[in-house]
Amino acid sequence: MLPIRRGNFYDRIGRPLTGVTPRWYALCIPGDSSYATLFPFVPFAQQAQLYARRNSITPFLIEVEDDLSANGVFMVADARRYLPTPIARHLIGYLDGDGHGMTGLEKAYDDLLAAAGDAQAVLCTTTARGDLLAGTTPQVQTTARGTNTAITLTLDANIQRACEAIAAQNMSKGCIIVMQVGSGQILASTSMPEFDPDDIAASIRADDTSLINRSLSAFSAGSVFKVVLA
């Protein structure tokens, strides 16, 4: 079973902010040398899982870094949740290990986004030893359970990227917010330091408070505000 797809986020003119980059899953079949073929292409974090299941008697899917169809491996294409360089990380948030929103808009709209995608599974007909039955091929089964719901934000992806670049070059901690005059719509919102939504554990270990969205945090005005009141 593949992870259930979620509804995506788009910027104000329809540019996707999530669900763009392809992700590949390879089918590992007992007894067909899948282990040796797949190991060099499996991300480091997944190598232990592949090694532990090398003698499995049932086929299973594992994420790999490239399309290995040319190597004779049965592949299933999916989409990574976040871009290679994630955008609006604090605003969008991140998912837990079960694919549910933990922070940001991912959490606020979790029920809606979770119900938006279809479920996929790979069906195999195998022998008692786990080998594919002669004359059969794996089949991808898609269960159309999704509502195809997506969420369009007021963000402008170009302005957001520009703000993130400026923040990365000029501040270790802080935030930048761009608001449209008149409508009050938020065109960009970035917070520093940033985190990797695909590796939350690294941010926790770093202990740099990168998970705090400073755009939404309260700051004490302090003595500098006395100038306004004077």
Model-predicted segments: where are they?
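A conserved glycine-rich beta-strand in the N-terminal activation segment of trypsin-fold
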Residues: 5-8, 173-175
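Short, glycine-anchored, charge-dense loop/turn motifs used at functional sites
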Residues: 2, 9-19, 163, 179-188
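Structured interaction and signal-relay segments at domain junctions
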Residues: 190-194
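Short, solvent-exposed alpha-helical surface patches in non-cytosolic proteins
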Residues: 88-90, 185, 227-228
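Carboxylate/His-rich catalytic cores and anion/metal-binding grooves
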Residues: 113-127, 170-189
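Small/polar-residue-rich segments within soluble enzyme cores
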Residues: 16-23, 28, 32, 36-148
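Structured segments of extracytoplasmic/periplasmic soluble domains
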Residues: 94-98, 112, 161-170, 189
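Active-site loop and adjoining helix of the penicillin-binding protein/serine DD-peptidase-beta-lactamase fold
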Residues: 142-182, 197-230
